[in-house]
Amino acid sequence: IPGRPESIGVQTKNLSNRKKNKKIEKKYSLVLKSLLQGCSILKKSKCKFIVIPCNTAHYWYDDLIKKIKLPIINMPKEVFIHTKKTCKKTSSIGLLATEGTLNTGVYNKFFDKSYKLIFPNINLQKNSVNKAIKFVKMGNVKAASKIIKPAINYLIKKRCKKIILGCTELPIAIFAFKSIKKVKSSKIFLDPNLILANAAMKKYSK
């Protein structure tokens, strides 16, 4: 299921404070209801399992698992498993994502015990990452590919072994104007949706 909270008008920037705020808790429940409806449709269609190609939507993962008796592949967890195969413990791992994904800690949940997650500073988040995501949504991929570079360079200077592209739009911004050869050689980047797709194919073939 797509599972984007924004698709039903819910902004995820402050959702991590939901237990202290009734309005935010209401928004959380609204998104959960929408996700459950999508999962129910897939369950009725006799799907073997569910994948959610939205990073932020995994903030609802635990509640979904409790209510939907169907396996759901956890994308951040799959990225963590993939990272363990290529990076030593305590390595610095960069994360480019929306503020919603960063604030809800869907990647911290898996990475914090073994790695040091590095995020862009506030200025780069607003003026590089957020704008790049917005430009891709607007169809201006060329502008996105330019404006994301400062955030990438920041993480490289922080000696990150890998950089997680934790938003669906970011691989488009980074790879759209590169040849297939250059994309394959860009080993520093981790595309969660590609990792999720591979995990889904492996699970389906079992």
Regions inferred by a protein language model and the residue ranges of each:
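Non-catalytic structural scaffold of enzyme domains
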Residues: I1-K206
